[in-house]
């Protein structure tokens, strides 16, 4: 009896060790299948704004950017991250073939390095490079209110 409980406990522990990772799916389509889709089929999966942008065409700058990403990926050693490709194209829609690339997205001052993950498909590059410095609200300054005048200054 004790031996059966021990065997079952070992089996349960092994099942816990073997973690199953959730595979990413964009709108019900897995990443491997997304890479195989044609442009027309991929456009049908995007939200309306991205679908309109793709149907009107990405333009020469976006095409040049994708070529640079492909080149960086092909030149990268096996199991290594590709070289960073810098861009000002904040309005570029993230496509499935961009997954795994490292992109330097310009925020108006510097290039923020972002590794493209599957969860980012369909979003814009600019969403991942904030253009402003969030405010850190501290103490009120002089002239804020009458009561704040009595707060000692540092």
Swiss-Prot record:
Protein name per UniProt: Small ribosomal subunit protein uS19B
Principal place of residence: cytoplasm
Entry coiled-coil feature ranges: none
Location(s), subcellular: Cytoplasm; Nucleus; Nucleus, Nucleolus
GO terms for MF: RNA binding; structural constituent of ribosome
One GO cellular component, as annotated: nucleus
Native source organism of the sequence: Schizosaccharomyces pombe (strain 972 / ATCC 24843)
Alphabetical keyword list: Cytoplasm, Nucleus, Phosphoprotein, Ribonucleoprotein, Ribosomal protein
Further comment: There are 2 genes for uS19 in S.pombe.
Keyword Cytoplasm: yes
Function: Component of the ribosome, a large ribonucleoprotein complex responsible for the synthesis of proteins in the cell. The small ribosomal subunit (SSU) binds messenger RNAs (mRNAs) and translates the encoded message by selecting cognate aminoacyl-transfer RNA (tRNA) molecules. The large subunit (LSU) contains the ribosomal catalytic site termed the peptidyl transferase center (PTC), which catalyzes the formation of peptide bonds, thereby polymerizing the amino acids delivered by tRNAs into a polypeptide chain.
PROSITE patterns: RIBOSOMAL_S19 (PS00323)
GO BP of this protein: cytoplasmic translation; ribosomal small subunit assembly
Modified residues (Phosphoserine): 63
Family the UniProt entry places it in: Belongs to the universal ribosomal protein uS19 family.
């Amino acid at each position: 009896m004790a031996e059966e409980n021990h065997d079952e406990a070992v089996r349960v522990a092994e099942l816990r060790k073997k973690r199953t990772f959730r595979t990413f799916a964009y709108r019900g389509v897995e990443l491997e299948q997304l890479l195989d889709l044609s442009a027309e089929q991929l456009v049908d999966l995007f939200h309306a704004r991205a679908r309109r942008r793709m149907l009107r065409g990405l333009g020469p700058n976006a095409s040049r950017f994708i070529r640079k990403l492909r080149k960086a990926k092909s030149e990268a050693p096996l199991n290594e991250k590709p070289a960073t490709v810098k861009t000002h194209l904040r309005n570029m829609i993230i496509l499935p073939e961009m997954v795994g690339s490292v992109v330097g997205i310009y925020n108006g001052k510097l290039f923020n390095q972002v590794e493209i993950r599957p969860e980012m498909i369909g979003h814009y590059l600019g969403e991942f490079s904030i253009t402003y410095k969030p405010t850190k609200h501290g103490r009120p300054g002089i002239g804020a209110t009458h009561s704040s005048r009595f707060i000692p200054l540092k």
